[in-house]
Amino acid sequence: MLECENLSCTRNNKVLFKNLSFKAELKSKILITGPNGSGKTSLIRSLSGLLPPVSGNIRHCGKDIYDDPKSYISSMVYIGHKNACKDSLTVAQNVEFWAGIRNTRELIVAAICCLQLQPVLNIRYGELSAGWKRRVALARLLISNANVWLIDEPFCNLDSATCELVLNLISIRSEQNGIVIITGHSSTEQLCDFTTIDIRNFNRLLV
């Protein structure tokens, strides 16, 4: 379980949200919604261990993620707006690099096949379209073999077919006792089975 208790976060001395609490049980799919600048990215970065909250606690399996970061990082994968890929490397080299970090080289073929990356494997990442770049970055979900997926706007720059593919991967991960938390501007019909947290509800608590 991933549990947040009374989280507050600031950016440039401005409070983004305050006293935000929720629990993500195994098999959870959670959508964090809100307009640009409302704190969605800051929240998911806090959940990833990259941005300590001003106050409150985040616990994974009962342990504060900031007290035991190594244990948490090994069970979590975070994909932000920046795709964290090297432009000078080919797609294949990027995938191999991630697998080397996670010691999961046995998952390379499955990740390539699931994200249908075969046509671009030998192309430098920097030469790809925005859609292909995002698809390559999402391969990290499978390469990581992580139980917790944190994805900031996963469908950005993707066509409808790839969006459906990613939704299927998310469903499979959650069904396998995973936890998936994503951000988006609003809920849609395709995301109707996600538990929605509107971050604006916690913006209104500011004093």
UniProtKB/Swiss-Prot annotation:
Main location: membrane
Bilayer topology: Peripheral membrane protein
GO CC, any one term: plasma membrane
Gene3D superfamilies referenced in this protein's UniProt entry, alphabetically: P-loop containing nucleotide triphosphate hydrolases
Superkingdom of the source species: Bacteria
Boundaries of every ABC transporter domain copy: 2-204
UniProt subunit comment: The complex is composed of two ATP-binding proteins (CcmA) and two transmembrane proteins (CcmB).
Protein name: Cytochrome c biogenesis ATP-binding export protein CcmA
Species of the source: Wolbachia pipientis wMel
Organism taxonomic ancestry: Bacteria, Pseudomonadati, Pseudomonadota, Alphaproteobacteria, Rickettsiales
